[in-house]
């Protein structure tokens, strides 16, 4: 069929999924902004650590995407399942490790920014701890998304992630401002709304996966991983993860510098970064689609189709 048409069909839902992720953060900022710039600064500061967590997510995410795409191209579904199993095992271990670090070292981590205002510091710590408790959902959803994208079914994760966004949009005003019987939780409410929405996404992914026997049957997640596939996943994902981690690290240093002028500059930086994300999320959507498309054709040894679409 038409390569351009196939690429756009794959890319548009992936781009949509990227924008859904951005909309999560924007929704939080809109409702938290009603409390004041101090609350936005607290959420923005703690949010750097979830952003840094993306570097960990990218290792099994890229590994799953490429490994599944190439296996599907070769029509080797058993090999695809091996990549799926290893990527899920890896993301669960990384989530537990990173969440433990964030909870144990929460005070020095937030202290890095030299915020100066005790209320902002306490709110940032509260947000960080609540998010850390649900970090496994935040980590595993992009890997499920990558598995479906690698399989060539990008519409499914877009729809599932959209359910999470709608859940978050409903819960944010209820939990942040306190509507009806719910207490006003402010910053804690924003964190709770986010992890509940992410948990809903994980549950829907698991239900969907149960019906996708060609991808998820007999995975045996508790079996020991083999080093060959683990190394390949790390080799595929580490360069992108390192780039993401360095980018976030620089942003954190900038935030530390501007924090000396108070909470408003931090809030402005956080909101500005969300708007800036529109440009690179568009490119990221096409990049992910190309990775899946090239991976499937590489696996199928359809070299001519690779060069045509590049």
Regions inferred by a protein language model and the residue ranges of each:
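Helix-loop-helix hairpin linking two adjacent transmembrane segments in secondary transporters
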Residues: 107, 133-141, 145, 149, ...
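Short alpha-helical transmembrane segments in multi-pass integral membrane proteins
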Residues: 1-11, 68-136, 182-238, 294-310
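Helix-terminus/linker motif at the lipid-water interface of multi-pass membrane proteins
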Residues: 19, 23-41, 110-118, 174-185, ...
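Residue-level signal for transmembrane alpha-helical positions in Major Facilitator Superfamily
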Residues: 8, 12, 23-24, 60, ...
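Small-residue-rich hydrophobic transmembrane alpha-helices
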Residues: 40-100, 138-157, 250, 255, ...
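Membrane-embedded alpha-helical segments of multi-pass transporters/permeases
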Residues: 26, 30, 56-59, 90, ...
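Signature of the first transmembrane helix
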Residues: 5-65, 69, 238-258
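Residue-level recognition of pore/gate-forming positions within transmembrane alpha-helices
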Residues: 14, 18, 22, 48-51, ...
């Amino acid at each position: 069929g038409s390569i351009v048409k196939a690429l756009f069909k794959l890319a548009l839902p992936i781009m949509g999924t990227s924008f859904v992720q951005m909309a999560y953060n924007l929704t939080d900022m809109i409702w938290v902004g009603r409390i004041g710039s101090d609350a936005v600064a607290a959420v923005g500061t703690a949010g750097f650590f979830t952003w840094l967590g993306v570097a960990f997510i990218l290792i099994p995410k890229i590994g799953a995407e490429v490994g599944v795409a190439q296996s599907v191209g070769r029509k080797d579904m058993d090999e695809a399942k091996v990549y799926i199993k290893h990527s899920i095992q890896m993301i669960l271990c990384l989530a537990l490790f990173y969440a433990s670090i964030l909870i144990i070292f929460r005070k020095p981590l937030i202290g890095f920014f030299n915020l100066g205002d005790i209320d902002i510091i306490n709110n940032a710590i509260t947000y960080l701890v609540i998010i850390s408790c649900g970090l496994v959902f935040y980590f595993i959803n992009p890997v499920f998304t990558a598995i479906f994208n690698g399989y060539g079914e990008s519409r499914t994760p877009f729809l599932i992630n959209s359910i999470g966004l709608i859940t978050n949009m409903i819960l944010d005003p209820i939990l942040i401002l306190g509507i009806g019987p719910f207490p006003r939780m402010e910053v804690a409410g924003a964190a709770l709304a986010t992890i509940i929405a992410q948990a809903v996404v994980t549950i829907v992914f698991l239900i969907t996966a149960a019906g996708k026997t060609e991808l998820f049957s007999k995975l045996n997640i508790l079996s020991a991983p083999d080093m060959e596939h683990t190394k390949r996943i790390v080799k595929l994902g580490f360069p992108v993860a390192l780039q993401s981690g360095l980018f976030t690290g620089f942003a954190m240093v900038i935030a530390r510098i501007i924090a000396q002028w108070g909470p408003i500059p931090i809030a402005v930086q956080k909101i500005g970064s969300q708007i800036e994300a529109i440009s690179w999320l568009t490119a990221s959507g096409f990049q992910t689609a190309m990775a899946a498309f090239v991976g499937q054709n590489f696996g199928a040894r359809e070299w001519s189709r690779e060069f045509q679409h590049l």
